[in-house]
């Protein structure tokens, strides 16, 4: 039986899983003829949900959505173990259901995300079409934002999920000309997403922190902080290059990497607020892809 802290509502379990359990039992019996499966042909209540065999749990989990699977992973160690394998058919089926085909078929876009479970997580952290300037739109792949050619306008977009704990990494790729302003960085939920003229909107107030890839300037509170990377004559960003942004909420800092090259600390003393990945652009028809790759490899 479950402990008090981990106890899963048995009534909910039986209600949610009863329709699927018959199918699961038949599939399990086709795979294995052990006597231990015969109890499922009678009544669900004869077996604790925490002791169901892996093959039965996988067959049942196949019918659940992402939110329910996340809850199941917190029920007990047995269920967590079943769902930990990142390329099981449960995650594969859900990924093919949730993530657009345009993204799954673009091997370059998700090349750093090998497993289906991590692809699902990346999609959950992608650009938010409902938290964007009206002059942007999200491409069908769900990971790439396109800025429409609107004159005298600076347009921004935030990611779906903000962070205020742990260490997180996103990868940005800028396709198309940069124009005079092309910033990537962080923003609170209060940061502006649109303004008139061509300005570095990301970093224009105390609610955002930006790196302008055009002139290699760090920006915050409407002030240029310093050139970045912190070297003489830093190289210009080349269209299509992948830039990784790492946010360390424990150290309240942010830094960037290009390939295996550490570019140095960009911002320190970040506030303990929920911060969202963001970008701002001014050039018409430019596109920016953002992929969440989880905690970075440290070493």
UniProtKB/Swiss-Prot annotation:
InterPro entries: B30.2/SPRY, B30.2/SPRY_sf, ConA-like_dom_sf, F-box-like_dom_sf, F-box_dom, FBXO45-Fsn/SPSB_families, SPRY_dom, SPRY_FBXO45. Belongs to the FBXO45/Fsn family. Component of a SCF (SKP1-CUL1-F-box protein) E3 ubiquitin ligase complex. GO terms for cellular component: neuromuscular junction; neuron projection; presynapse; SCF ubiquitin ligase complex. It is found in: Synapse. Residues 46-94 form the F-box domain. It holds the Pfam family SPRY. Component of a SCF (SKP1-CUL1-F-box protein) E3 ubiquitin ligase complex which may regulate restriction and/or maturation of synapses. The keyword Transcription does not apply. GO terms for molecular function: protease binding. Keywords: Synapse, Ubl conjugation pathway. It comes from Brugia malayi. Pathway: Protein modification; protein ubiquitination. It comes from the Eukaryota. One of its GO terms (biological process) is dauer larval development. This is F-box/SPRY domain-containing protein 1. Residues 105-297 form the B30.2/SPRY domain.
């Amino acid at each position: 039986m479950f402990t008090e802290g981990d106890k899963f509502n048995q009534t909910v379990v039986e209600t949610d899983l009863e329709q699927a359990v018959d199918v699961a039992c038949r599939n399990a019996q086709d795979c294995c003829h052990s006597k231990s499966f015969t109890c499922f042909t009678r009544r669900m209540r004869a077996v604790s949900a925490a002791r169901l065999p892996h093959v039965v749990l996988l067959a049942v989990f196949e019918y659940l959505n992402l939110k329910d699977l996340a809850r199941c992973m917190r029920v007990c160690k047995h269920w967590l173990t079943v769902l930990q394998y990142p390329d099981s058919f449960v995650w594969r089926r859900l990924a093919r259901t949730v993530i657009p085909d345009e993204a799954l078929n673009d091997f370059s876009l998700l090349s750093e995300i090998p497993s289906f479970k991590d692809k699902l997580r990346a999609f959950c952290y992608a650009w938010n079409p409902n938290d964007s300037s009206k002059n942007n739109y999200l491409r069908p792949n769900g990971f790439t934002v396109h800025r429409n050619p609107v004159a005298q306008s600076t347009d921004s977009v935030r990611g779906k999920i903000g962070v205020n704990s742990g260490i997180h990494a996103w990868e940005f790729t800028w396709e198309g000309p940069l124009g005079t302003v092309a910033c990537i960085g962080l923003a609170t939920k209060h940061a502006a997403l649109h303004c008139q003229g061509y300005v570095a909107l990301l970093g224009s107030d105390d609610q955002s922190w930006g790196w302008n890839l055009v002139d290699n300037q760090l920006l915050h509170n409407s002030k240029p902080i310093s050139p970045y990377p912190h070297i003489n004559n830093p190289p210009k960003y080349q269209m299509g290059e992948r830039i990784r942004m790492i946010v360390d909420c424990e150290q309240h800092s942010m830094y960037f990497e290009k390939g295996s090259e550490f570019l140095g600390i960009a911002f320190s003393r970040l506030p303990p607020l929920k911060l969202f990945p963001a970008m701002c652009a001014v050039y018409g028809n430019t596109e920016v892809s953002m992929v969440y790759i989880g905690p970075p490899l440290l070493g």
